[in-house]
Amino acid sequence: MKSILIMGGSDFIGSALAKRLIKCGYQIDILTNGKKEIDYNGFKEHLICDRKVRKDMENIITGRKYDYIYDMTAYTKEDVSNLIDFISMDNLKKYIVLSAGAVYKDSGRNIKEENEKGENENWGKYGLNKKEAEDFIINSPIPYIIIRPTYIYGENNNLYREYYFFEKIEKNEKIPVPKGKQVSNQFIYIGDLVKVLESIMKNPHVREAYNVTNPQLISWDDLIYTCGEIIGKEPIIKYVDMEKVEFRERTYFPFRNIDFNLDINKLIEHGLYIPNVLLKEGLTATYKWFSANKPKMHDRKMNKV
């Protein structure tokens, strides 16, 4: 049986991946900082450690052997080195890292994996840190796979995005939307993402990076009106002319007003799972969860709403 370590397991992506792998019969350990309760069973061991404290990681990781490591919580090169400097490489077949589309130097359309990486003013330090973590991994001998997704949504999302629209529409409140530049974005449903991650274990390719998203192109109106259709209410949209206001769109909107779509031909050509859940289907499942759980969330950047 394959032995697997998931770095993460208590938040949105890590918990969804853990639940998927447990359901499929894999033997997994999870490593979290222990601050959040784990709401599922079936893992072999729960390792509790702050991965940013190097000595603690050395104590808990040294000598452990895994066939596959899924790293869902690596944000800096230090996060990576605190793991791979101590983990045993004896059995390791793949180190699978969740990076981000934010590593690309330019935001735009149809971005391919070979596009230049670098600092992007839209993503700031987050994207640059992810890029530096990638570079550290690529320059190491570890058998890596790097995943670069677009916007991830779904049940248990810890970012206040689709839930914000659900709340506004339910309450018949106006939704301010940036107007000016017409942009298109891509989204990937969490259920699709974890299937992509699982498929990596079964695929022969190694030391590769992949863009991961559903190829469907979505405008802000598409996103908001789809939410309204699912709820059964007409959204009330108030367009904000970006040329007539001095504040940036992130102060009143949960996304940056930029094009963000990636080319996934490499993913397809290499035989990995292809995301196929369209926006309406994924948001329908998400809203069902949202209605049952009513999470209380906010976005500190959205201070002009």
What are these regions (language model features)?
Residues 134-156:
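Conserved beta-loop-beta element that borders a ligand/cofactor-binding pocket
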Residues 159-165, 178-201, 208:
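Substrate-positioning beta->alpha
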Residues 156, 184-191, 210-230, 277, ...:
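Substrate-binding strand-loop-helix patch
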Residues 199-252:
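Mid/C-terminal beta-alpha module of Rossmann-like enzyme folds, strongest
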Residues 82-129, 137-139, 145:
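Conserved Rossmann-fold NAD(P)-dependent oxidoreductase catalytic core, especially the SDR/UDP-sugar
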Residues 246-273:
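Conserved C-terminal active-site "lid" loop/helix of NAD(P)H-dependent oxidoreductases
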Residues 278-305:
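Amphipathic terminal alpha-helices
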Residues 4-24:
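N-terminal Rossmann NAD(P)H-binding glycine-rich loop of SDR-like oxidoreductase domains
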